[in-house]
Amino acid sequence: VTAICGIWNRDGRPDAAQDVARMRRALAPYGNDRSAAWDDGAVALGIGLARLTPEDRFDRQPLAARDRFHLVADLRLDNRAELAEALGLIQRLATLADADLLLAAWERWDTDTPDRLVGDFAFALWDAEHRRLHLVRDILGNRPLFYHANNDRFVFATMAKGLHALPDIPLAPDAFTLMDCIALAPRRGPRSFFADINRVEPGQRVTVHADGRIEPVDWYDWNTPRDLGLRSDDDYVQAMRATFDTAVAACLRSDDPIGSHLSGGMDSSAVTASAALQLAQRGQRLSAYTHVPLAGARLDHWGDRTLDEGPLAALLAARHTNIDHVRVDAAERQIGDDMDAQFHAAEYPPFNLCNQVWMTEICRQMQQRRERVMLVGIMGNATISQQGVERLPLLATTGAWPTLIREGIALHRRGWTAQRVASSAIGALLPPHLLDALRRRFRGKSPPRDLLAYAALNPALVENPDYRAHLEQLGHGLHLPSPRSPRALAVSILRHTDVMGLTAKGQLARFGVDQRDPTGDRRVIDLTLAIPPHLLLRDGQTRWIYHRAFADRIPPELRNQAGKGLQGADWPTRIEQARGTLATELDRANPTAETLLAVPALRALAAADTGTGRVTDAQRYDQRIKLLRGASIAHFIRKAQRRND
């Protein structure tokens, strides 16, 4: 993970390098193994390198080619051999940095280059011949990239603090982005968490022209599945296993020890198992970290969810003699105790403060063990372990009634109630108000449709028809149907937010830990979005292809568990411990926070007595979602306005 920055003074002023030097100093926490810059008077590029792969020792950015192209890149390329073969560089590959391959690729394929890349990347390329600047990010946005533009110049940086190092770009929160964050809405459009600073969106190329035009182009097509040449069911099963192992192998490029998150779920288990098998062949060990609840804590008994994932994770760990299983309860940590550090390092408000506690503690423990790479399976729900239930409404809309009936009966035989089968099959096809009425009739309850039931927004904003229309345009309206196919659901999950890159930068700056997610590998995404729905739900078996691909690796107790794990199940006790911190933060809420948030209601929630009994649905929405996210955003606003009162 590296930090890049640059300035183009379109008015011709020759002092760009001076400001780039300021930006590089501000970005030093994200890359201080090597710092360098390229200066051409009105245009300057800077880089602060963090060496995280073996090939990073060959990195000599900024790079230049033919006195035309000048490149700075924050990247880890995961298809190095494939690129080198296509570029005729395979004999030199061992001594080429990833940036060398990227520049050679751009010389060959120009703006078609991003579609040939696999990995995490954000880069800037100055085309001196055509006087254009290109900014590009990978499809999931695992490396952030921000910019600011005015009539005279264009400025970009990996993190907003690089832009805020310049005196004419003041630090201030972006109210509109924060409103969507409070509403749990998906991120769309270029706005960032900071005023007057835009982001290059995931899967996008932003081209800046000499006349000041800023042209965003989506280089990745989310709408059209790729033809991967797979024909039989077995072809897909074998491709799933092989592609996933290739993705994991790419994430193991490191000279340092490696750790992984290991929950009791399917995604992190698949990642950990694949990594352990491959590391064993090298004679290396793997630390697998599992969050477990505080001893004696009041837990949230939510449906059939697994509250302590430690025992399930231990079953997987026990299969591998080279896994060191570490259970983390973060007993010495408290909700909100590192919000200041989070703000300065990651520069966004954490969405889930109760999970932030153990995630941060795992990074601390990895730092103590000198482990620099952390494997995660965050995107697995949308890729390797898609449940496939959305096949049912797809069958209904295409008129495949015999197949729909057969799958419904098979699900019922596996323990699904008739009501659940019917709701899954036709729920996405019904108007939400009618679906809610049916759920209340047969289940006794339905999920809340009132935005204020789960979002800590100021009620005045919720009543604004323009804002409601905005949410519906995002596909987050309160009365919109659910996705009608597995692919539609997967795309909505993969594109929902854009904070993974910020999370990774924050962990790198604070702990020197580089987060890598093979479940979000471009090849894995292309494959899973092309999988026929009958390989996801088949004969009543959800996640059919996952079971076929990984049955010999994942314990049956884990694969066949009825419910999902509930991370942070000890949140009721955690919140009780942190009520003083949360109340203090809300008491410090400034006018901007009071405009966006329902501050009086949040203060009441911070002081509420939730008792000692079973957690109710209302308490879960109020305490875990509204209170914690509201306090996090109030803190972010205060820090972004440089206020400590």
Regions found by a protein language model. Give the residues of each.
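Glycine-rich active-site loop/lid subdomains used to bind and stabilize high-energy intermediates
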Residues: 8, 34, 47, 305, ...
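Short hydrophobic beta-strand that contains or immediately precedes a catalytic carboxylate
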Residues: 72, 375, 520
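An alpha-helix initiation/capping motif
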Residues: 100, 238, 269, 356, ...
